A protein has these predicted regions:
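Helical segment within the ABC ATPase nucleotide-binding domain
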Residues: 163-176
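Catalytic Walker B motif of ABC-type/P-loop ATPase nucleotide-binding domains
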Residues: 149-153, 158
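The feature captures the beta-strand-to-loop junction immediately N-terminal to the Walker
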Residues: 31-36
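Helix-to-loop junction immediately C-terminal to a conserved catalytic motif
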Residues: 49
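A short, flexible loop at the N-terminus of ABC-type nucleotide-binding domains that lies
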Residues: 1-20, 27
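ABC-family P-loop ATPase nucleotide-binding domains
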Residues: 79-136
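Conserved ABC transporter NBD signature motif
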Residues: 57-68, 72-73
């Protein structure tokens, strides 16, 4: 993924959140983005996935500008946002509706991840706590087997054992050569 001369502001009257940001992110590695609250970390992630449009510059995934929203590009990354809502139906239906967008989706991987987080496959998403919803989305995201997994504050809302399980799960996934 390459980001070139990316600038963004939420309002034309205010200062830019990001100004002429350029970087290259190599596939198959874990990166962390550190900074104070409100400096644009989440904004950068949304720009990287094409959910926000930069005022200048561009972000490309495998040579394709993410703003084009091409299916082959969209199916190669998954974003776990810091805050999200899940529909009020069971996980099986969620998987049935969303997994087809990810050609490498691995149902066995999903089941293994759910087991690690002690979540049943038939959970009703609308009845879960925020931490449980985060665990369910992490399990789904890892099962997509995308080349790029972008996570915004992935352990927010997880209890201490959940954070430990998350780290173990991520290490296992990296060792299995995503």
């Amino acid at each position: 993924m390459t980001i070139e001369h990316l600038s963004f502001g939420y309002s034309k009257r205010k200062n830019r959140v990001l100004n002429d940001c350029s970087l290259r992110i190599d596939e198959g590695k874990i990166y962390g983005l550190l900074g104070k609250n409100g400096v644009g970390k989440s904004t950068l992630l949304y720009l990287m996935t094409g959910l926000l449009t930069p005022t200048e510059g561009h972000a490309c995934l495998n040579g394709t500008d993410v703003r084009l929203r091409r299916p082959d590009t969209l199916s190669d990354f998954f974003l776990i946002p810091e805050e999200f809502d899940l529909p009020d139906y069971n996980l099986q239906k969620y998987v049935r509706l969303n997994a087809p967008f990810y050609p490498h989706f691995d149902h066995e991987n999903l089941l293994r991840n759910l087991e690690m987080f002690e979540l049943p496959e038939d959970i009703k998403l609308g009845e879960l706590s925020m931490g449980q919803k985060k665990k369910a989305l992490i399990c789904f995201a890892l099962a997509t087997r995308t080349s790029w997994l972008i996570m915004d504050e992935p352990t927010n809302g997880l209890d201490i054992p959940g954070k430990s399980q998350f780290r173990k799960l991520l290490i296992r996934e990296m060792n299995e050569s995503r």
